[in-house]
């Protein structure tokens, strides 16, 4: 069994992206599943292209994408991706789409196909705050989640997929008073816990 995990490079003036720091620290094997790791650029369309290339290469049982959501307090397991780009800031190559469909012929939205409620409950059992989020935003994170689910749907692939937003790391909020953060250790434990739930779910549906 293979689980593909994606993370982003830094964006918006940050020198690090916690999603990539978490990715680098994940175990290579979790519950018997090989963990395939890839960093994708914080760039509209190119992020999806890179993820799809890897999906074609490794044929994973599930894809879990991780992204930074500065200002959030907890591990946010996303429920839905919507078919719109509406960028508050430019991406890493200067693109800033406003009110633009990701795929003009795609569905209005796709729900995550990983077990989001079980993931939240298991993370909480590790004494790490977590919740279901009903919006992944309209920036590159939502774009990637939608793009992956859209690709899976259109090609009728038996691959589960979802997205988890994580807070800033403490080092990122040194000059951001009152902005929440979470330790790298807790975030790694949370994502590995989520992967365990996903692996169990994939085994059940085989």
From Swiss-Prot:
Active site residues according to the UniProt entry: 78, 141, 165
Keywords per UniProt: Cytoplasm, Hydrolase, Protease, Thiol protease
Subcellular compartments: Cytoplasm
Catalytic activity: Release of an N-terminal pyroglutamyl group from a polypeptide, the second amino acid generally not being Pro
Record-linked Pfam families: Peptidase_C15
Chief localization: cytoplasm
Gene3D superfamilies reported for this sequence: Peptidase C15, pyroglutamyl peptidase I-like
Enzyme Commission number(s): 3.4.19.3
HAMAP family referenced in this protein's UniProt entry, alphabetically: Pyrrolid_peptidase
Job description of the protein: Removes 5-oxoproline from various penultimate amino acid residues except L-proline.
Subunit structure: Homotetramer.
Family: Belongs to the peptidase C15 family.
Protein name stated in the entry: Pyrrolidone-carboxylate peptidase 2
């Amino acid at each position: 069994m293979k689980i593909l995990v994606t993370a982003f490079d830094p964006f918006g003036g940050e020198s690090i992206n916690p999603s990539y720091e978490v990715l680098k620290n994940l175990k290579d094997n979790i519950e018997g599943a090989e963990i395939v790791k890839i960093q994708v650029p914080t760039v509209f369309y190119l992020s999806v292209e890179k993820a799809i290339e890897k999906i074609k290469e490794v044929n994973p049982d599930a894809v879990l994408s991780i992204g930074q959501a500065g200002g959030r307090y907890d591990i946010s397991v996303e429920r839905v991706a919507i078919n719109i780009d509406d960028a508050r800031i430019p991406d890493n190559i200067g693109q800033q789409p406003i009110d633009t469909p990701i795929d003009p012929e795609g569905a209005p939205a796709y729900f995550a196909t990983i077990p989001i409620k079980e993931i939240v409950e298991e993370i909480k059992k590790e004494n790490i705050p977590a919740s279901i989020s009903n919006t992944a935003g309209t920036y590159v994170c939502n774009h990637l989640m939608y793009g992956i689910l859209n690709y899976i749907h259109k090609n009728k692939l038996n691959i589960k997929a979802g997205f988890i937003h994580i807070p800033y790391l403490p080092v990122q909020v040194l000059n951001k008073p009152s902005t929440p953060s979470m330790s790298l250790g807790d975030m790694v434990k949370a994502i590995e816990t989520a992967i365990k739930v996903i692996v169990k779910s994939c085994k059940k549906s085989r």
